[in-house]
Amino acid sequence: VLMTESEAPRFNLIDEPWIPVSMVDGTFGEVSLRELFKKTASIRAIAGDIPQQAAPILRLCLAIVYRTYALVREEYLRHDEEVDPIELWQEVWEDRAFDLPLLNSYFDQVHDRFDLFGPKPFMQVVGLEYAAKEYDPVSEFIADVPKPERFLFSMRSKAAPETITFAEAARWLLFCLAFDCAGIKSPVVGNTHVTSGK
Protein backbone atom coordinates (compact mmCIF):
# COMPACT_ATOMS: atom_id res chain seq x y z
CA VAL A 1 0.00 0.00 0.00
CA LEU A 2 1.48 3.32 -1.06
CA MET A 3 1.28 6.34 1.22
CA THR A 4 0.41 9.79 0.04
CA GLU A 5 3.17 12.39 0.25
CA SER A 6 1.57 13.96 3.33
CA GLU A 7 1.44 10.56 5.10
CA ALA A 8 5.03 9.63 4.33
CA PRO A 9 7.55 10.00 7.16
CA ARG A 10 10.24 12.63 6.87
CA PHE A 11 13.91 12.21 7.71
CA ASN A 12 16.26 14.68 6.11
CA LEU A 13 19.94 13.84 6.49
CA ILE A 14 20.88 17.52 6.42
CA ASP A 15 18.85 18.32 9.55
CA GLU A 16 18.26 15.06 11.46
CA PRO A 17 21.02 13.50 13.59
CA TRP A 18 22.16 10.21 12.03
CA ILE A 19 25.97 10.27 11.85
CA PRO A 20 27.55 8.61 14.91
CA VAL A 21 30.58 10.55 16.08
CA SER A 22 33.12 10.42 18.87
CA MET A 23 33.96 13.85 20.19
CA VAL A 24 37.33 15.26 21.24
CA ASP A 25 36.10 15.33 24.87
CA GLY A 26 35.47 11.55 24.81
CA THR A 27 31.68 11.65 24.46
CA PHE A 28 29.68 10.03 21.69
CA GLY A 29 26.61 11.23 19.85
CA GLU A 30 24.81 11.54 16.54
CA VAL A 31 24.89 14.63 14.36
CA SER A 32 23.21 15.78 11.16
CA LEU A 33 25.23 16.71 8.09
CA ARG A 34 24.80 20.40 8.92
CA GLU A 35 26.00 19.83 12.51
CA LEU A 36 28.94 17.72 11.33
CA PHE A 37 30.38 20.59 9.32
CA LYS A 38 29.58 23.10 12.07
CA LYS A 39 31.33 21.04 14.78
CA THR A 40 34.34 19.73 12.84
CA ALA A 41 36.84 21.09 15.36
CA SER A 42 35.21 19.18 18.23
CA ILE A 43 34.64 15.87 16.39
CA ARG A 44 37.40 13.27 16.71
CA ALA A 45 35.99 10.66 14.31
CA ILE A 46 32.96 9.30 12.53
CA ALA A 47 32.10 6.07 14.32
CA GLY A 48 29.63 3.82 12.49
CA ASP A 49 27.69 0.82 13.82
CA ILE A 50 30.60 -1.18 12.42
CA PRO A 51 33.97 0.35 11.47
CA GLN A 52 33.31 -0.05 7.73
CA GLN A 53 30.36 2.35 7.94
CA ALA A 54 32.61 5.35 8.52
CA ALA A 55 34.17 5.30 5.03
CA PRO A 56 30.94 5.74 3.01
CA ILE A 57 29.74 8.48 5.38
CA LEU A 58 33.07 10.26 5.07
CA ARG A 59 32.92 9.83 1.29
CA LEU A 60 29.49 11.48 1.21
CA CYS A 61 30.84 14.40 3.27
CA LEU A 62 33.81 14.73 0.95
CA ALA A 63 31.50 14.85 -2.09
CA ILE A 64 29.51 17.63 -0.39
CA VAL A 65 32.69 19.62 0.29
CA TYR A 66 33.99 19.11 -3.25
CA ARG A 67 30.70 20.25 -4.77
CA THR A 68 30.32 23.22 -2.45
CA TYR A 69 33.80 24.56 -3.08
CA ALA A 70 33.50 23.82 -6.82
CA LEU A 71 30.53 26.22 -6.82
CA VAL A 72 32.83 28.91 -5.37
CA ARG A 73 35.33 28.33 -8.16
CA GLU A 74 32.55 28.43 -10.80
CA GLU A 75 31.38 31.77 -9.39
CA TYR A 76 34.89 33.23 -9.68
CA LEU A 77 35.21 31.96 -13.26
CA ARG A 78 31.83 33.48 -14.15
CA HIS A 79 33.32 36.88 -13.27
CA ASP A 80 36.49 36.13 -15.25
CA GLU A 81 38.53 35.80 -12.08
CA GLU A 82 40.92 32.94 -11.52
CA VAL A 83 41.00 31.18 -8.18
CA ASP A 84 43.48 28.55 -7.14
CA PRO A 85 41.70 25.51 -5.61
CA ILE A 86 44.76 24.89 -3.44
CA GLU A 87 44.37 28.37 -1.96
CA LEU A 88 40.73 27.59 -1.14
CA TRP A 89 41.77 24.41 0.68
CA GLN A 90 44.60 26.24 2.43
CA GLU A 91 42.06 28.76 3.76
CA VAL A 92 39.92 25.94 5.14
CA TRP A 93 42.99 24.31 6.70
CA GLU A 94 44.23 27.51 8.31
CA ASP A 95 40.76 28.51 9.57
CA ARG A 96 40.26 24.97 10.92
CA ALA A 97 36.65 25.34 9.80
CA PHE A 98 34.53 25.14 6.69
CA ASP A 99 32.72 28.15 5.26
CA LEU A 100 29.36 27.54 6.97
CA PRO A 101 27.35 30.15 5.04
CA LEU A 102 28.61 28.56 1.83
CA LEU A 103 27.73 25.03 3.00
CA ASN A 104 24.33 26.17 4.29
CA SER A 105 23.60 27.80 0.94
CA TYR A 106 24.42 24.52 -0.81
CA PHE A 107 22.33 22.53 1.69
CA ASP A 108 19.38 24.86 1.07
CA GLN A 109 19.68 24.33 -2.70
CA VAL A 110 19.68 20.52 -2.47
CA HIS A 111 17.63 20.04 0.72
CA ASP A 112 14.89 17.92 -0.90
CA ARG A 113 17.47 15.47 -2.30
CA PHE A 114 18.56 14.42 1.19
CA ASP A 115 15.15 13.26 2.46
CA LEU A 116 15.19 9.52 3.08
CA PHE A 117 11.47 9.26 2.24
CA GLY A 118 10.72 12.19 -0.07
CA PRO A 119 9.33 11.99 -3.60
CA LYS A 120 12.92 11.45 -4.76
CA PRO A 121 14.32 9.54 -1.77
CA PHE A 122 18.01 9.92 -0.97
CA MET A 123 20.12 7.53 -3.06
CA GLN A 124 17.14 5.30 -3.91
CA VAL A 125 15.09 4.48 -6.99
CA VAL A 126 11.36 5.19 -6.77
CA GLY A 127 8.87 2.61 -8.00
CA LEU A 128 10.95 -0.57 -8.06
CA GLU A 129 8.78 -3.65 -7.70
CA TYR A 130 9.96 -7.18 -7.04
CA ALA A 131 9.04 -9.44 -9.93
CA ALA A 132 7.91 -12.50 -7.96
CA LYS A 133 9.04 -12.23 -4.38
CA GLU A 134 8.02 -10.81 -1.03
CA TYR A 135 10.18 -8.14 0.53
CA ASP A 136 13.26 -9.30 2.42
CA PRO A 137 13.44 -8.61 6.16
CA VAL A 138 15.38 -5.55 7.29
CA SER A 139 18.12 -7.86 8.62
CA GLU A 140 19.19 -8.48 4.99
CA PHE A 141 20.14 -4.82 4.90
CA ILE A 142 22.50 -5.03 7.89
CA ALA A 143 25.96 -6.42 7.23
CA ASP A 144 26.69 -7.97 10.61
CA VAL A 145 23.37 -9.76 11.15
CA PRO A 146 24.00 -13.42 10.35
CA LYS A 147 21.46 -15.64 8.65
CA PRO A 148 20.01 -18.06 11.24
CA GLU A 149 21.33 -21.11 9.40
CA ARG A 150 24.83 -19.60 9.22
CA PHE A 151 25.11 -18.22 12.74
CA LEU A 152 28.54 -18.92 14.17
CA PHE A 153 30.88 -16.03 14.94
CA SER A 154 28.84 -12.89 15.40
CA MET A 155 28.66 -9.98 17.80
CA ARG A 156 24.88 -10.00 17.40
CA SER A 157 22.30 -12.41 18.75
CA LYS A 158 20.49 -14.90 16.54
CA ALA A 159 17.35 -12.80 16.81
CA ALA A 160 17.35 -10.53 13.77
CA PRO A 161 15.96 -7.03 14.28
CA GLU A 162 12.51 -6.48 12.83
CA THR A 163 12.88 -2.71 12.68
CA ILE A 164 15.65 -0.15 12.67
CA THR A 165 15.64 3.60 13.24
CA PHE A 166 15.67 6.05 10.35
CA ALA A 167 19.22 7.03 11.38
CA GLU A 168 20.36 3.39 11.18
CA ALA A 169 18.58 2.99 7.83
CA ALA A 170 20.49 5.98 6.42
CA ARG A 171 23.83 4.55 7.58
CA TRP A 172 23.12 1.05 6.26
CA LEU A 173 21.87 2.48 2.96
CA LEU A 174 25.19 4.23 2.39
CA PHE A 175 27.06 1.13 3.53
CA CYS A 176 25.14 -1.11 1.10
CA LEU A 177 25.69 1.26 -1.79
CA ALA A 178 29.42 1.32 -1.05
CA PHE A 179 30.09 -2.32 -0.18
CA ASP A 180 27.21 -4.49 -1.37
CA CYS A 181 28.69 -7.60 -2.86
CA ALA A 182 27.93 -9.04 -6.24
CA GLY A 183 25.73 -12.07 -6.54
CA ILE A 184 22.14 -12.95 -7.12
CA LYS A 185 19.84 -9.97 -6.67
CA SER A 186 16.07 -10.09 -6.54
CA PRO A 187 14.74 -9.33 -10.02
CA VAL A 188 12.63 -6.19 -10.37
CA VAL A 189 9.89 -5.47 -12.87
CA GLY A 190 11.37 -4.00 -16.04
CA ASN A 191 14.93 -5.24 -15.46
CA THR A 192 16.18 -6.57 -18.79
CA HIS A 193 19.19 -8.34 -17.25
CA VAL A 194 17.19 -11.08 -15.53
CA THR A 195 18.11 -14.62 -16.54
CA SER A 196 16.15 -17.61 -15.20
CA GLY A 197 14.44 -15.40 -12.61
CA LYS A 198 17.77 -14.18 -11.14
Which role fits each region the language model picked out?
Residues 1-156, 160-198:
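Conserved small-residue
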